[in-house]
Amino acid sequence: MTEKELLAARQSIVQKLTQARLEKGLSQEQLAKRIGTQRSNICRIEKGTQNLSLDLMIKIAEALDKDVSVMLEERSSTMEKVYSLRLYDETLLTFTLEERGLEGLQATILRTETAKQKLFPLDLELTNEGVVKWLERRVIPKNRQFVDEILKTLGLSVNNTKGIMDVCMGLSLNDSYWVVPADFDGKYADYNLYENRFSEALSLVAYTGVGGSREAFSTSPELTTNGMLRKAWRFVEDDGIYLYKGGTEGAANTGNEPYSEYYACQIADKMGIGCVQYDLENWKGILASKCRLFTDIDTSFVPIGRILRKTTLKACLDYYKTLGDEFYEQLCSMLVFDALIYNEDRHFGNFGLLRNNHTGEIIAPAPIFDNGLSLFNYAMPDDFKNLSAYAKTRSNPYRISYEDVCKEVMGAKQKAQLRRMVDFKFTRHPSLNLPEERLTAIEKQLGERTRELLSIPVQRSTKRKNEPER
């Protein structure tokens, strides 16, 4: 349905209600008093300068003795496919969304609030295809553990993007956008995941893979959370929202990711690099790393891969330079930190930026998080007999050696941060730890790695002077 067709359908309903008012011999003032509103609202609706909400349509129809069901059917046929992308209660984009057989899910943009464009998602391409891609990226990924169990609880399939959106409204703990029918009257304050309790039952399904029957309605961050491991968001009374994340399973060398999260954040702390704090907990008999949500209702996280047109390390470094020294230095420090701990999974989806939701401004680098595939988490006991040799077999996702990355980004600040790691020892958890011999071997390797990285000369300051402005 085009915007013109949508407007015509709305006008048809309003005209019928206006005609019914005139047949009753009621003035706009009299009708307004009957339904408990202002005459100005009736006037604007009949002039077409104010949209007719569902609640107001029902009240007017009942006051005029019109069949509400007929009105609802007519309204439903025009509105059931029309959605709005909102930031809080502000509409940014209005579009239709429908399944079209072999064509799959199709969107048609009806209206763009261009005056609010600085508030739009940074990764939203304002085309019909771009809207569909944005929605598909927003829902639970197909490779997430227990994805089928999570969606089965709600009577949905992994390919049903529209159905998932209809259930979860696109609500997320990454930002404050949501996607609802265009005539939806609800307020963000009553539905957002930051301030309202979400489905504990669905969190258990997400973490354990075991759950019950479909709930009538379930707002849940599980339907918009990325990543492949078992995980769940939990609201801890008087404390906040936490992410519980398990480890890999199915082989002798799996399951160590929660330990790596716990120990790696100690290294970041020692180096003085902003990072998310992790703890360990056995929840439902399964070891999990536990961290507090680092976004809030006013601040969103934007993965760098959602911003860059070309996802390469060079493009990323160039972009961070345009943001200023604080951003660039944090990125360089993260890359040196990753080289130190042999992080094998620093992809373009698990680091990025913090954004002010009200202004659209990028305000800070996001804290470092998601370090589970580091500190030799997959190493077998035999690998620890010669950990230095095993370390040389580790690699990052960039297809560039850790050492070559460090040669590019090493600066005086990173050198100072590395010096703090001399003679570093982990703080043991009170009850949940890797075997002591494994921890001791990792500490020894960290000492050797620190000295290796400190031997890399600082070339960055001279090199940057010769680089052209971007």
Residue spans for each PLM region:
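Short basic helix-loop element that most often maps to the first helix and adjoining turn
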Residues: 15-34, 59
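A short, Lys/Arg-rich alpha-helix, primarily the initiator
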Residues: 1-23
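Phosphate/dinucleotide-binding and metal-coordinating scaffold of catalytic cores
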Residues: 76-336, 340-342, 354-470
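DNA major-groove recognition helix of helix-turn-helix/homeodomain DNA-binding modules
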Residues: 55-70
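Helix-turn-helix/winged-helix DNA-binding modules
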Residues: 23, 49-52, 343
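Canonical protein kinase catalytic loop motif
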Residues: 347-348, 352
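Recognition helix of helix-turn-helix/homeodomain-like DNA-binding domains
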Residues: 33-51
